[in-house]
């Protein structure tokens, strides 16, 4: 494997373990020329799942495309790379486990939004604004209105008592 920093092939595996999804082996490697470390993943090559776009085009399911969109939505939020990877792993696992050869881009987007909704409201709204193609502030307001009732329910005390007696 070529070192992504210096391009040399001379490296060794420092650590090897199953990824959280258990569908890949995560390897930490050290380049013996520049001494820098990098991570690689080894996984079984699957038959491709095709994503049917809104305009009818088909393209192969692309984990990196989903990862990129989620990373943008989670920028400057208190969300770890591991949490982002878990979301992507969950999306990928759900579609692979379904054993479908094709899946609509709408189903993919909705699944990502569902998982982001549970993780972080701001990341969810950011992702939704791109995915649902918000045109103006009114679109944001409508989405935020749907979040307010949920937030109120989450903030209520478990015993149902209020502070005023």
UniProtKB/Swiss-Prot annotation:
Gene: nrdR
Cofactor requirement: Zn(2+)
Keyword Membrane listed: no
Source species: Desulforapulum autotrophicum (strain ATCC 43914 / DSM 3382 / VKM B-1955 / HRM2)
Positions annotated as zinc finger (unnamed): 3-34
ATP-cone domain residues: 49-139
One example of a Gene Ontology biological process annotation: negative regulation of DNA-templated transcription
HAMAP family per UniProt: NrdR (MF_00440)
Record flagged with keyword Zinc: yes
Cofactor note: Binds 1 zinc ion.
Protein name, per record: Transcriptional repressor NrdR
């Amino acid at each position: 494997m070529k070192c992504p920093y210096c391009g040399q092939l001379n490296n060794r595996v420092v650590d090897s373990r199953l990824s959280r999804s258990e569908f890949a082996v995560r390897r930490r490697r050290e380049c013996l020329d520049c001494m820098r470390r990098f991570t690689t993943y080894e996984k079984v090559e699957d038959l491709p799942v095709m994503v049917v776009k809104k305009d009818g085009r088909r393209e192969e399911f692309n984990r990196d495309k989903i990862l990129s969109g989620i990373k943008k939505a989670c920028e400057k939020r208190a969300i770890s790379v591991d949490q982002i990877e878990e979301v992507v792993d969950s999306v990928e696992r759900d579609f692979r486990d379904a054993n479908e050869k094709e899946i609509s881009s709408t189903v993919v987007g909705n699944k990502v939004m569902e998982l982001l909704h549970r993780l972080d409201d701001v990341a969810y709204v950011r992702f939704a604004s791109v995915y649902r193609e918000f045109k103006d502030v009114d679109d944001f307001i409508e989405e935020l209105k749907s979040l307010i009732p949920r937030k109120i329910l989450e903030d209520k005390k478990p015993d149902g008592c209020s502070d005023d007696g």
